[in-house]
Amino acid sequence: MERLMIEPLTAEAFAPFGDLIDVLGPPDRLINAGLCGRHHDLARLDFDAEGRAGISLFDAQARTLPHVLDLVERHPLGSQAFLPLDGVPFLVCVAEDADGVPVRFRAFLTAPGQGVNILRNCWHGVLAPIGAPGRYAVVDRIGPGANLQEYPLPVPLLVEG
């Protein structure tokens, strides 16, 4: 089994695969008579013309490190954002595409409270909270069409931190 090492999650490192959703620095603007800071437009949401944005809640079972990555998926019709509701960090494994096959895997671990938006058609591992179960708000495409492609890895990867 090949090893995949977790690397630091930064906006720059994750940019080819999506967006880091985090409160970095002061808010972009103050709203509500100055009582609320708005961190504005943090993700590139992208849905085909037949779909719309929807918000779902996911309850995910805890995983541990090292983690065996044996299945990835992608969503050809829309992006998918994961926002932790309880602060549980989660593993984010992503890969480039080569003619329908995931290649050149990378692994990241969110800090408590960080979320990610995964770009449309980007291969990624399933939701994997580390150390405790997690609840997540997920913003993704709702609508007709096949928006899930799964790819079982012929040789699983061992993700280590």
From Swiss-Prot:
Q: Mind listing the GO biological process terms from this record?
A: allantoin catabolic process; purine nucleobase catabolic process
**GO MF annotations, alphabetized:** ureidoglycolate hydrolase activity; ureidoglycolate lyase activity
- Entry's EC annotation: 4.3.2.3
Q: In which pathway does it act?
A: Nitrogen metabolism; (S)-allantoin degradation
Q: Which InterPro entries match?
A: RmlC_Cupin_sf, UAH_cupin, Ureidogly_lyase, Ureidogly_lyase_bac, Ureidoglycolate_lyase_dom_sf
Alphabetically ordered keywords of this record: Lyase, Purine metabolism
The enzyme's first-digit EC class, named in words, is lyase
Annotated Gene3D superfamilies? Ureidoglycolate hydrolase
Top-level taxonomic group: Bacteria
**Required cofactors, per record?**
Ni(2+)
Q: Which reaction does it catalyse?
A: (S)-ureidoglycolate = urea + glyoxylate
- Subunit text: Homodimer.
Q: Name the family the entry cites.
A: Belongs to the ureidoglycolate lyase family.
State what this protein does.
Answer: Catalyzes the catabolism of the allantoin degradation intermediate (S)-ureidoglycolate, generating urea and glyoxylate. Involved in the utilization of allantoin as nitrogen source.
Give the protein name, as stated in the record: Ureidoglycolate lyase
Q: Which gene encodes it?
A: allA
